[in-house]
């Protein structure tokens, strides 16, 4: 629900929809424009930079949808028909002889002159090898017409389409060996906090294992990003400045932790020094604090340090921002009307997301 329409305002809290709108506008102002030609085998997860236009009809010729017998319906008036040829997938049939039928298999091209296929379960063969059709027939039954799925010249995938198994299979069916895609988004990932320790190391007093960076790197790789692992930053302003300054070649710096208004908010301090910081308190739980700014011209998104908050804000806000920079238009998270599983109160943030272990999934 939009806080502007809910009658339950939260002063100082930005509705998630408004935050997403701002992020998408910022993304559109700095699109990734470089284009690469990549082989289909390397295109999974990439974003199409040029429309995919059908270079042939699909199917390229009329073919049988069933194992059965192909005939010209005008030749049949209830009599048995002799078999004049046998057609398998990949064969080049000859024109159908008048008054005959052809044994045909699924996917095989229909012979010239045939317009109907009867499935093999509905026929009988007599001792002479002639075919008896036991049921009424209709012109075009069990036939996949040429161009039934796609016509030559049609745009089958638009600019900005994300390429996955279905899209790549479609491109292959049209004979495309390479596709024009946006270059990968270069994203640096860092975590902040003296309390963080890498998995496998011994924990000291007050320390926790760093899970957020591994979560984000895995998700970014699935999005097709080129990831720079910038490690863990201690709570030190000078070290933060140095780390951010060394990442000038990336398209985005994605950090977790250090986005509060406390004394240890060294990421925010560094961005304030650069003069480009927006600290948004979102009407969402988990995930209230979110930082967006620039450091020496490089966009920076600061996510909360709590793992649940990191997961939610990345999925709802950072991920759409990155996809929009690559030209993807449909980036908004899908919404579903489902039971909330908790009592609504005006003291709650505008979006309250319950954990999976409580409700089986995240609910809005």
Task: Give a label for each model feature.
Residues 11-80:
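Intrinsically disordered, low-complexity, positively charged segments
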Residues 23, 68, 153, 189, ...:
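Residue-level signal for inorganic ion chemistry
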Residues 17-20, 32-41, 45, 49-50, ...:
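Flexible glycine/proline-rich
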Residues 24-31, 51, 73, 110, ...:
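Structural signal for hydrophobic packing residues in well-ordered secondary-structure cores
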Residues 44-57, 90-103, 151, 292-293:
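Short, hydrophobic/aliphatic alpha-helical segments
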Residues 3-12, 16, 177-303, 307-312:
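Helix-rich terminal scaffold detector
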Residues 3-16, 70-229, 361:
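Short, glycine/charged-enriched hinge/interface segments at domain edges or termini
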Residues 52-57, 140-143, 172-178, 324-326, ...:
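Glycine-rich, charged/polar anion/phosphate-binding loops
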